[in-house]
Amino acid sequence: MISTAIQQLVNYGLDTGLILPDDEIYIRNQLLMTMQLDDFTAPEGEVCYTDLESILKTLVDDAAARGVCEDNSTARDLFDTKLMGVLTPRPSIVRANFEERYENEGPQAATDWFYKFSQDTDYIRRYRIKRDLKWVTKTPYGDLDITINLSKPEKDPKAIAAAKLAPQSAYPKCQLCAENEGYAGRMNHPARENHRIIPLTINDSAWNLQYSPYVYYNEHCIVFNHLHTPMKLERATFRKLLDFVGLFPHYFVGSNADLPIVGGSILSHDHFQGGHYEFAMAKAPIEKKWVFPGFEDVDAGIVHWPMSCIRLTSEDDSRLVELADKILTAWRGYSDESCFVFAETDGEPHNTITPIARMRDGRYQLDLVLRNNITTPEHPLGVFHPHAKLHHIKKENIGLIEVMGLAVLPSRLKKEMAELADVLVSRTPAAQYPEELQKHAEWAGDILARHPELSADNVHPILQDEIGQVFAEVLADAGVYKLDEAGRAGFVRFLASVQ
């Protein structure tokens, strides 16, 4: 039985091209060593398999039963990654393959290959990504992408307890560091034996390309500084973003803002996120054209989007860098009390930008989304952040991915929405809702008022649409300049101040 599973994994490696026929005996023996087995009985006849997940489950179940690995969710992930690491070619081979395709077939062929490779190695776990719930909601701002993230593993209680007892280590310094490549992992740090990165040079500095293991959208990649250095938004950031889309014109790339609340979850390591996907914000039109003095050659304007976005387009990327830097510098020091925009309070800076770069019809394009992280007693998590009445759906930071129009919502919503559907269909009074649904009660009442036709047949699409509309409100809350007369006038005042 276990010999069959080992041969199935070898055959999987051969079928995907991770290993070559000359490697078969060697790889089989390396897998035996990893499994702490001494014997192998060649299976009779042709060895077939259905999917990678079931092969790995068979092998990990056996290893756990024999005490080779612990039987909790994290230890199992560490061990199956160790098995896949046996099949994964060394970095030098991967990079040579990528570079050969880039030079001979072009950048898209190179990334197509690397993306498939990152899935074949199980670094991107296809079978987990499929669990994510995804849909599209039509809004006045375009079609917003909504996803309930179920692919990021939630640790079971045994794994959480083991992680607390695990010795602390400062290596690698964070989960983005280049030193993760090939790292075996531990109870409080994921295994990366099957992880490979591609070196890049942008703005004459060493960076790397990898994919996100959680793939929130097509070819979701991470571009990160080779050095563990903090996020910093500056003139060089725009140069790096535009250099990247010059290298990979079929990809967009953007940076999270560099301040808490409006930034991403990792501020300690300078990095960007990109991919082969067009978000609603990229499709959104210009609602007001603008000409910046001295930059008449750059097409500019305000984007029709709930967050405050300036779009710049030019054939000359150096002109975009110069103008974007001018806008960033102006915004860092800009205050407008009438719109509750304060550059700083008590010496703490508040203004920053979320920038996104892409190629559009052979021209360079930058979207600059204005951000401000000021807090008040009324809005302790941020004035320009989802307000409390929306926290039942989304209370986390609005980072780069959300800014562009993709909601990454917590996994708890899958269970809560299934339960909410039942109480809506049965017209259960809000006072009788179970405790975990109380936070949705007011919203649920509004849904019933809007949809008296709600029934068991249509409750799920109605709930999906309503969640999407909440996300549109989330984006509006996070927008510095509101989409009303006062907000638009305030936005124009800022643009006019950029000299």
Description of each model-found segment:
Residues 1-223, 227-230, 306, 320-324, ...:
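Active-site microenvironments that recognize anionic phosphate/pyrophosphate groups
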Residues 171, 266-270, 278, 294-297, ...:
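Short alpha-helical interface elements
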Residues 193-198, 226-253:
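Helical scaffold of the NTase/Pol beta-like nucleotidyltransferase catalytic core
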Residues 236, 245, 249-265, 274-335:
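Catalytic or ion-translocation cores adjacent to nucleophile or general acid/base/metal-coordination motifs
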Residues 260-268, 346-352:
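Beta-rich nucleic-acid/ligand-interaction surfaces
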